[in-house]
């Protein structure tokens, strides 16, 4: 009776193995769980361990293929049977060969027909632990690398809240005109040619509210052309042009004329009285100081950093 069961089982095994891919196990038959570190079958039968699960270690406790003096590719006969009548090697075979040599140490051979219930893997466990530690370490390294690279980029593009706090500020050649005191007047050269040039009045009178700190602090005294300048006292405005003729009954005004003082041709209609409360008094001129340069350079570097980082 036991011999018949064994022979019938061998005959069924040969039929299964003769089919193309009959003894191979699909990945859907095996359930992988990282928590339990085990491989659980979903249905009974001859379950084979897939190739991507098998570690490269020899089976230490009972290697049937090597004990019989046969290689892995040889067919193993069902001569050795356990007490229950099942052959001890029938738990795992791959298409006519013994796969017990590929199992890790510590795995007991399963009875026939039941498949492998549970594989307690020591080496796969350690391998998975090393993989998880490598993943965590690599992710941490990536995080540290990204933070370091971003801080390096910030330090290269923009160093400190202002330019003077930068360690490289002392190494830069500062122009000599920055050392001039604020109260000193700029040298103004009169234009070559006659004063009665073809420059309209409203072109000279274009002005705006001073925005830089030095212009606010110095007022209009620093500007080379202001109505306090004695060189401009004799200039008379007639028909939208400057003329050098001195007439005591005309006054020079530096205020911006309003639109109702212009005729159809765009020229002023007459003398314009200065409005003292106007914020546009005085001819506008750009006075560049060290504070202005640092302010604009700091603002430019902030914009450049925002553009590089994509936050603008």
From Swiss-Prot:
One of its GO terms (biological process) is mRNA methylguanosine-cap decapping. Residues 68-77 have a biased composition (Basic and acidic residues). Residues 85-103 have a biased composition (Polar residues). It comes from the Eukaryota. GO terms for cellular component: cytosol; nucleus; RNA decapping complex. Residues 8-17 have a biased composition (Basic residues). InterPro entries: PNRC-like_rgn. Disulfide bonds: none annotated. One of its GO terms (molecular function) is mRNA phosphatase activator activity. Residues 1-26, 45-106 are annotated as: Disordered. This is Uncharacterized protein C18G6.09c. It comes from Schizosaccharomyces pombe (strain 972 / ATCC 24843) (Fission yeast). The lineage of its organism: Eukaryota, Fungi, Dikarya, Ascomycota, Taphrinomycotina.
